[in-house]
Design a protein with these regions (language model features):
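Catalytic zinc-binding patch centered on the HExxH motif and its immediate surroundings
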Residues: 1-8
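Short alpha-helical catalytic segment bearing the HExxH-like zincin motif
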Residues: 11, 25-33, 37, 75, ...
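Short pre-active-site segment immediately N-terminal to the catalytic Zn-binding motif
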Residues: 11-28, 90-95
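Post-signal-peptide, soluble extracytosolic/periplasmic N-terminal scaffold domains
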Residues: 23, 27-30, 50-58
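Catalytic Zn2+-binding segment of zinc metalloproteases
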Residues: 24, 34-51, 69
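Acidic/histidine metal-binding catalytic segments
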Residues: 46-54, 75-77, 112-122
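Membrane-active amphipathic alpha-helices enriched in small hydrophobic residues
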Residues: 53-69, 76-84
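Extracytoplasmic and endomembrane cell-envelope/extracellular-matrix remodeling and assembly machinery
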Residues: 84-226
Length: 226
């Protein structure tokens, strides 16, 4: 996936670029992370954690006093303080994710991408993570339920006009290079050779680039130059 870091930096895994089915989907994830930065979520999260330390310290003080007379009471007081602190942090995280989704949609639209890319990509994430969602208690999730987030996104884009956006050649070339870097060189050569032979590609230029890159990995330099 992708993540926001201190200083306004954003990290992107190559797996995300390969998993997206359009440039708008990739842009939607980046818009979400950019919104984390512009809305100062990390700084606000750290501030919330600092505020959460006071209840924890009070619970610890109560636990120490209670331990003199009743160890079970002491343990209960400490666990209550910990649970309250964790729940408060999770609430902040869920709110930040919702805000980043909403701000991200606006940013995506202003940048000229298809805003439906966000709902499409998160929809696939929901399918991949369904097993996790069915077994994890909702209140412990650090992100809102995927179904809730998708529903909110779809509600926000319904009133907006449809915009079909073609993928740029740069995006397709990057995807081709990453896919040509997967697995063994011979496997990559076979994969791209098959795509070109069967004409199973979005862009012939990107497919030929991936094939040449795979051939170079396999040390077939003369064939790659052709």
């Amino acid at each position: 996936n992708a993540f926001a870091m201190p200083g306004g930096f954003i990290g992107v895994h190559t797996g995300l670029i390969m998993a997206t089915q359009s440039e708008s989907e990739l842009a939607s994830v980046l818009a979400h992370e950019i919104s984390h930065v512009t809305q100062h979520h990390l700084a606000r999260q750290l501030g919330a954690q600092s505020q959460a330390q006071l209840p924890m310290l009070l619970s610890l003080a109560v636990a120490i006093l209670a331990a003199r007379s009743n160890s079970d009471l002491a343990q209960g007081a400490l666990m209550t303080g910990q649970a309250a602190s964790i729940q408060r942090q999770l609430n902040y995280s869920r709110d930040f994710e919702r805000e980043a989704d909403r701000q991200g949609i606006q940013l995506l639209e202003r940048a000229g991408f298809d805003i439906r890319g966000m709902a499409n990509f998160f929809g696939r994430l929901q399918k991949y993570g369904r097993l996790y969602e069915n077994n994890a208690p909702g209140y412990l999730r650090t992100h809102p339920l995927t179904t809730e987030r998708i529903a909110d996104m779809e509600n926000r884009i319904q009133s907006r006009p449809y915009r079909q956006v073609a993928d740029s050649l740069d995006f397709l070339l990057v995807q081709a290079k990453l896919r040509a870097s997967e697995g063994t060189p011979l496997d990559a050569v076979t994969k791209f050779s098959s795509q070109l032979r069967e004409r199973n590609f979005t862009s012939e230029i990107a497919a030929r680039y991936g094939y040449a890159f795979a051939l170079a990995r396999d040390k077939q330099y003369a064939a790659a130059e052709q």
